[in-house]
């Protein structure tokens, strides 16, 4: 049976500590209650907490996946994914933030294209830094949830973020 293309939803912000991870995990819970198969990808490469919150036992992370892709050792994306329960699976951020700068963003579309037909919903938790990896995830997203607080610094960053998206060709 062929599966429909899943929806990619990215939860992002230009500020840390606004609840991106909690929002992502709450959405995973909502979709799983609707019997939707969900993959949570933790692209907060400098301090991802999804694996910690879900008590992941998987030793392989997105860093291992990208390393194996770049060294032609990749076989199956399922080898890197931890199944939390019947409906929620995760692809964890690196355990060591020093690996974040060693990850080649060109593999992000390959990763997302490998999972988009395996899951009903792909939820992406990002870092607050607008880097190449975040640009790729935003570009491939069906829905972008941008979280912000009501302070002048964050509002200024939100305006800059929206300008960057508009300049990059994001219209909606």
Please give the residue ranges for each predicted region.
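Acidic-aromatic/histidine active-site loop/patch
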Residues: 1-8, 163, 167-169
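Short loop/turn elements that form and flank the Walker-type P-loop nucleotide-binding site
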Residues: 5, 34, 84-85, 117-118, ...
């Amino acid at each position: 049976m062929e599966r429909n293309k899943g929806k990619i939803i990215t939860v992002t912000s230009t500020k840390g500590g606004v609840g991106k991870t909690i929002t992502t995990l709450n959405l995973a819970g909502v979709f799983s209650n609707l019997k939707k198969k969900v993959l949570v990808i933790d692209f907060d490469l400098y301090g991802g907490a999804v694996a910690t919150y879900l008590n992941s036992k998987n030793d392989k992370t997105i860093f291992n996946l990208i390393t194996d892709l770049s060294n032609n050792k990749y076989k199956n994306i399922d080898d890197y994914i931890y199944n939390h329960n019947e409906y929620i699976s995760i692809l964890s951020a690196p355990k060591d933030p020093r690996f974040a700068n060693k990850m080649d963003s060109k593999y992000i579309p390959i990763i997302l294209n490998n999972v988009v037909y395996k899951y009903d919903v792909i939820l992406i938790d990002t870092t607050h830094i607008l880097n190449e990896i975040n640009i790729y995830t935003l570009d491939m997203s069906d829905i972008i949830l941008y979280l912000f607080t009501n302070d002048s610094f964050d509002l200024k960053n939100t305006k800059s973020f929206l300008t960057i998206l508009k300049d990059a060709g994001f219209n909606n």
